[in-house]
Amino acid sequence: MAVMPDKWIREKAENSRMIEPFVNHKSSKGVVSFGLSSYGYDARVDNKFKVFTNVNSAIVDPKNFSENSFIDKETDVCIIPPNSFVLASTVEYFRIPRNVLVICVGKSTYARCGIIVNVTPLEPGWEGHVTLEFSNTTPLPAKIYANEGACQFVFLSGESECEKSYDDMKGKYMNQHGITLPLVK
């Protein structure tokens, strides 16, 4: 597998709509950086968040997920309570080619503040907004800035197309829009 460079990412975004909307340069002045980088793409976090709360004494169960586990916030700055967790999604919509696997890594700016972002791989043939999981590992409240960089996606090109893509397998998170909660089918 090869890590794909900026030129390839740009071509796929502009000609195959792999990333929409696509920022063709790195934006970093006064913001957490986002946009095209040398060997990846720094995606932005949308302004809708699901902040976990214990107000309703809900139990987090991935097989029976309760919407009472969180409160919805639409804001330019999301405050993550100490040692807590927030769901969000990317501003960008991704369409992953059949011969590409995408992995996500966190932003150094957030990691240095104890904020960790987790995203599972984007499978070949998958498309949608990416649901982002932010953890505040500190004993203090922490901020996430909407419409600024959240994480970096690295595109790995396989030697050939896969036999069965995420789309072929009718993956449960296919074509997701906004924040998608856990699904066990």
UniProtKB/Swiss-Prot annotation:
Q: One matching Pfam family, short form?
A: DCD
Question: EC class of this enzyme?
Answer: hydrolase
Which pathway does it operate in?
Pyrimidine metabolism; dUMP biosynthesis; dUMP from dCTP (dUTP route): step 1/2
Write out the residues that bind dCTP.
K107, S108, T109, Y110, A111, R112, T131, L132, E133, Q152, Y166, Q176
Q: Which residues form the active site?
A: E133 (proton donor/acceptor)
Q: Which UniProt keywords apply?
A: Hydrolase, Nucleotide metabolism, Nucleotide-binding
Q: Which residues cross the membrane?
A: none
Any GO BP annotation:
dUTP biosynthetic process
The record's catalysed reaction(s) read:
dCTP + H2O + H(+) = dUTP + NH4(+)
EC number(s) in its UniProt entry?
3.5.4.13
GO molecular function (one):
dCTP deaminase activity
- Subunit architecture: Homotrimer.
- Family statement: Belongs to the dCTP deaminase family.
HAMAP family found in the cross-reference section = dCTP_deaminase
Q: What the protein does?
A: Catalyzes the deamination of dCTP to dUTP.
User: Could you identify this protein by its name?
Assistant: dCTP deaminase
Source organism per entry reads: Wolbachia pipientis subsp. Culex pipiens (strain wPip)
